[in-house]
């Protein structure tokens, strides 16, 4: 009985070993199949991972089989030993049954693992088939797209060829013409936009500026006396003319030599004219001659004494004029050494406008402008009052402008840098940078451009008008040019065939810039370009 049990056990073990051998053969075939497949996608990678896990399970199964074989061999050895040691058949039978139960469980576990391995392999094969099918579909779709692109390129070439034939130009020529057309449209649009922006900004700025200037001017009303180059000295009688002339003209020669003026005695009754371009010397001569006429004693010595007394009075008048101007301008803290220089401006004129009164008016205008726009009132008032300080020394200093001389005098007598810079920049000899600089320029322009404030000779006026018209007619396309309102307005007629509407705007801007650079015109100059086209036809008999 024991021998039969052992034989059955041996047969069972042999069957298990054979089954394991078959499973190993199947595993080797699966591995060879796996190595031949091309993994080209994410699903294949995942399938490989599942296959790897299945292979690991197979390896674990092999280890378990080996372990079971070892246990079986050990059990057989123990069974043999126990059979030899057993004294009865029951003990051997129970041992064999236990061994068979162990073997049965091992076989069931191996069978279950083999089933899982087969299932994993089946899923892997299905995934590979799907990937291959997708690859084939993608290749077919790519081929179709390539064919479609080729067809589109062919049709595009046919269309371009037909368009070139119909248009009578090549593709490059059409592109160049389109670029040129777009460029013209862009320029026209840019000019229209720029003109609209400039017009709107100018209108807004002019409205605001007119409001501010009107508010400022209505609070500043100044009397303005324009001196001439001739002073009149009344005489008590015509006999006094002979005494003024003296024996053989001795008195008049001495008077002209001492005073530096020209004495004009004509047929006009009871007056003598004193002519001189220097108002101070003319005023000294007038007072000296008035004293001589009142005294009645006219000879070279009395002429010299009267001249000295007049010079002393003029110096006192300069100090009084400076103090009065400071009071009217609202300035009280200034270096006393500047008073004689400021007072001498009482006898200086610019285009007939008295410079000292002009400085006072500028100071008041600048203070009001500063108050309107929120600038420093006192700095603007001071800079505007001193802006023409250099005119007191300009005739005696060559090679320097009155703005540069005035700035140097202001620096010498302790004025602030802001005031100095405003004085130097009020005629754009240096660039204006601060609000004070622009306010001083504006006040100077308002005072000078006010109607009746300044005048010039007819010859200079006509020459300036001719120059302005010549500048305008020098531009191509200009037919006629008319300077109006003392050069403050230009009306220009252009050839409508040579200048279109957009070029007319650009031409007006160019002419305005040229006039501003080449001619000095008080105030602003407005340039109007007129482009008129007329078509006239006649019908009927004369």
UniProtKB/Swiss-Prot annotation:
Residues 229-289 form the KH domain. Pfam families: HD, KH_1, RNase_Y_N. Residues 355-449 form the HD domain. One of its GO terms (molecular function) is RNA endonuclease activity. It is a single-pass membrane protein. CDD domains: HDc (cd00077), KH-I_RNaseY (cd22431). GO terms for biological process: mRNA catabolic process. One of its GO terms (cellular component) is plasma membrane. It comes from the Bacteria. Keywords: Cell membrane, Endonuclease, Hydrolase, Membrane, Nuclease, RNA-binding, Transmembrane, Transmembrane helix. Residues 52-92 are annotated as: Disordered. Residues 59-92 have a biased composition (Basic and acidic residues). It is found in: Cell membrane. The chain crosses the membrane at residues 1-21. It is an enzyme of class 3 (hydrolase). Its EC number is 3.1.-.-. Belongs to the RNase Y family. Endoribonuclease that initiates mRNA decay. This is Ribonuclease Y. It comes from Cutibacterium acnes (strain DSM 16379 / KPA171202).
């Amino acid at each position: 009985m024991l021998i039969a049990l052992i034989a059955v056990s041996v047969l069972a073990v042999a069957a298990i070993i054979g089954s394991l051998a078959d499973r190993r053969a199947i595993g080797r075939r699966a591995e060879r199949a796996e190595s031949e497949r091309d993994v080209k996608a994410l699903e294949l990678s995942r399938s490989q991972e599942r296959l790897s896990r299945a292979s690991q399970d197979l390896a674990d199964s092999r280890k378990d089989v080996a372990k079971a074989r070892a246990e079986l061999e050990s059990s057989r050895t123990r069974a043999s030993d126990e059979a030899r040691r057993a004294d009865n058949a029951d003990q051997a039978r129970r041992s064999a049954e236990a061994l068979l139960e162990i073997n049965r469980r091992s076989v069931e576990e191996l069978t279950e693992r083999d089933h899982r391995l087969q299932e994993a392999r089946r899923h892997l094969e299905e995934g590979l088939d799907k990937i291959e099918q997708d690859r084939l579909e993608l290749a077919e779709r790519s081929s179709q797209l390539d064919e479609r692109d080729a067809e589109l390129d062919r049709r595009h070439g046919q269309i371009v060829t037909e368009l070139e034939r119909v248009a009578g130009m090549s593709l490059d020529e059409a592109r160049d013409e389109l670029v040129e057309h777009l460029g013209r449209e862009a320029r026209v649009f840019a000019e229209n936009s720029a003109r609209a922006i400039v017009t709107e900004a100018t209108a807004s700025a002019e409205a605001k500026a007119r409001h501010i200037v009107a508010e400022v001017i209505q609070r500043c009303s100044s009397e303005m006396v324009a001196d001439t180059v001739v002073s009149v000295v009344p005489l008590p009688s015509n006999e006094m003319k002979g005494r003024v002339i003296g024996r053989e003209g001795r008195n008049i020669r001495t008077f002209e030599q001492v005073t530096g003026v020209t004495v004009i005695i004509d047929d006009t009754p009871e007056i003598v004219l004193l002519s001189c371009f220097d108002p101070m010397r003319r005023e000294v001569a007038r007072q000296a001659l008035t004293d001589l006429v009142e005294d009645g004693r006219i000879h070279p010595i009395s002429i010299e004494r009267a001249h000295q007394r007049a010079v002393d009075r003029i110096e006192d008048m300069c100090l009084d004029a400076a103090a009065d101007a400071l009071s009217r301008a609202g300035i009280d803290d200034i270096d006393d050494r500047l008073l004689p220089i400021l007072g001498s401006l009482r006898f200086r004129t610019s285009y007939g406008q008295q410079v000292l009164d002009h400085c006072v008016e500028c100071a008041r205008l600048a203070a009001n402008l500063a108050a309107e726009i929120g600038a420093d009132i006192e700095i603007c008032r001071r800079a505007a009052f001193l802006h023409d300080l250099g005119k007191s020394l300009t005739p005696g200093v060559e090679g320097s402008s009155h703005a540069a001389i005035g700035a140097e005098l202001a620096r010498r007598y302790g004025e602030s840098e802001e005031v100095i810079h405003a004085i130097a920049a009020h005629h754009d000899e240096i660039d204006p940078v601060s609000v004070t600089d622009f306010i001083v320029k504006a006040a100077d322009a308002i005072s000078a451009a006010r109607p009746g404030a300044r005048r010039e000779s007819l010859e200079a006026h006509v020459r300036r008008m001719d120059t302005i018209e010549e500048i305008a007619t020098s531009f191509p396309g200009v037919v006629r040019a008319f300077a109006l309102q003392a050069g403050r307005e230009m009306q220009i007629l252009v050839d409508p065939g040579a200048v279109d509407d957009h070029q007319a705007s650009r031409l007006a801007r160019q002419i305005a810039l040229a006039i501003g650079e080449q001619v000095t015109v008080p105030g602003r100059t407005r340039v109007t370009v007129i482009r008129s086209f007329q078509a006239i036809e006649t019908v009927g008999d004369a």
